[in-house]
Structures are given as C-alpha cells and as structure tokens.
Amino acid sequence: MGGTRDALRQAYVGEAKAALRLKVFAQKAEEEGYPQMAKLFRVIAWSEEIHGARALRVLKEIKTTEENLAESFQSEQGVAEVAYNQFVKEAEADGDQAAVLHFSQSRDVEETHAKLYKEAMNHLMEERETTYHVCQVCGYIADGPPPENCPVCGIGKEKFKAFR
C-alpha cells in the first residue's frame, strides 16, 4: 500500500469535498440572483464528481450492488453510532448549540440511512419501486410519501423533495 493508492484516495476525498462545496456555492449564487455563476459552479461540481468516480474505479472500490449496500450500511451505522455521538459531545463541551443541533440531527438522519440500506439488502432481489422524499433542511429520507412534519427537524412536508 501507500504511494499511488494513497494519492488516489486523497484525490477521491478532495474531489468529493470540492463537488459538494461547489454545489452549495451554486445554491448561494442562485439565491443572490447569479444564475450563470450558479451554472458554472454546478458544471465544475459535476466535473469534480467525474474525477472522484474515476479515482474510485482505479482503486477498484466499486463492487457488486450487494457488497456496496453492505459497505454503505456499515459506514452509515458507524458514523451514526460513533462519529456523530463524539461530535455532539465535543460541541456540547464547547457550548456551540448550533453545532449540537447539526450533529444530533445529522446522526439521526444517518441512522435512517442505515435502516434504508438494511431494508434494501433484505429486499435486493425484489427491486421494489419506491419514491423517496428528502427533507431539504436536515436530509431525512422518507421511504414513500413525506410526513406532515420531518421527524428530525420538524419542518413541514412542503420542504421535502421527491426522488422517483
């Protein structure tokens, strides 16, 4: 290990971070009335995603769907149970209530991600069709119709986006 493989992993992480940051920048540009700047941020974000995906392919880290589901489940479960709980404790110790809210809601959403992966692993062969609804405030995912209010952040169902 080392050398090239580490460089590929670093490239993947860097590209993923850049893509997300640019998507958020695009949202801000839209809010401020700069649609062409938003488009530029989005197109570069897409390009960064391509770079990150290529690094994953070179690393041979894209496996079968069943293996990808199992890995994703383990990752989400670990993040929810370990990382976010530690982040909450640190934010509480620092007295940063905005960070406490962010970390605790993110932890709760990560737990729902793990449940969705677990359910998908149990029903892989069925390949059932569903519409997911994602809370645009905290990221909670409803499997089916959106709830009247998000169970994590409390926002109304009008803030949910459908994914068909």
Go through each PLM region and give its residues:
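Non-heme di-metal
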Residues: M1-R164
